[in-house]
Amino acid sequence: MRIASFNVENMFDRAKALNGANWAEGRPALEAHKELNTLFEKPTYSAANKAKMLSLLQANGLSKSDEGPLLRLRKIRGNFIKRPRVGPPEIVATGRADWIGWIELKTEAVNEVATQNTARVIAAVNADILAVVEAEDRTTLRLFNEQVVGETIFNAVQASPYRHVMVVDGNDDRGIDVGLLSREGLPIVSIRSHVDDADANGVIFSRDCAEYEVRLPSGQSLWVLVNHFKSKGYGAASANDAKRLRQAKRVREIYDEHLAAGEDWVVVLGDLNDIPGNQPLAPLLQNGSTLRDIAQHPNYRDSDNRPGTHGNCTASGKLDYILLSPVLFGKVSAAGIERRGMWGGVNGTLWPHFDEVTKAEEAASDHAALWAELDL
């Protein structure tokens, strides 16, 4: 049985602020999106609050219109802003109770060839159980599975769509949720979301740690914990690190709870957004954890001899993981990485890629897909 993880970076539509050449390009809009929505929730708007709102709106092209290049001001009811023909705009709402609305990220269609190349990666990996990161929603993933994966020809063989498709909406409103696809005979028999898990500092997961129980033909349950940890893309590095550490601690607790219950067929996988030696991932990779990284398995093969999974796949780009409980790690017969859907460097010369990837915009993703073959 083959298990895989792939950050698809959306299939059909993606937030424009996330779709630039690099993180820095969309960072101001992403930060404004978060800060404005936080300010909007205040019961009373102080003069300083209003000044900050106006400053952020102007910086993002929203002082004269509800439509900016990357953001949209969505107003449902009540009065929020006055935009006179002469003179500066003015925030007329005195607090949250005066109006209903928010800032949303504008989306754009993903390059059609890139969408097809995403399906080529999935067909090439040909996993029995596939964890996906950054899926828009279940409907989109289902349609992608049926209409794109199911129509893909890879190595002259028609790719087969998955029988079971599931996404649970997480805490991120940018359409970058985690999900699972599985083949016929591998039903998803239970789902547990952790979107509401909290500690003393608040909600833990930026998206979710979605737990899927997959029933194997033998009757054995395989527990698959799909994750997408806090990114390094924007915000203070110290705060981001602290958030990922909290997330890793909670995933470790969930994993240990399964082991304590005698459920020792557990997979933790996804985009953890940090490298192995850094403190945020210590609860999963150190600190007495029994989880094992498939990249450390003697049967793991990487023909490109590059340590990373993201960007140019240097050591600082090892962000994606398949972590296995000891029982499962002992059943690994093969493991590897699929980079042919990535571009690779400025000129796309760092590794071989599909013929259909002729430029960076046609890449399936900035992430490689990881896979592990297990004798189950």
Annotate each predicted stretch with a short phrase.
Residues 217-220, 225-241:
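Active-site His/acidic residue clusters
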Residues 1-159, 167-170, 355, 362:
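N-terminal, active-site-proximal structural segment of metallo-dependent hydrolase catalytic domains
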Residues 114, 118, 137-140, 244-247, ...:
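Stable alpha-helical elements in mature extracytoplasmic
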Residues 110, 129-131, 135-223:
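Structured beta-strand-rich core segments of catalytic domains in phosphoester-bond hydrolases
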Residues 2-4, 15, 192-205, 213, ...:
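Metal-dependent phosphoester-hydrolase catalytic domains
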Residues 8, 135, 229, 271-272, ...:
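Active-site metal-binding loops of divalent metal-dependent hydrolases
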Residues 123-127, 140-150, 186, 253-260, ...:
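Sec-exported extracytoplasmic/periplasmic mature domains
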Residues 137-139, 172-177, 232-234, 273-279, ...:
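Active-site environment of divalent metal-dependent phosphoester hydrolases
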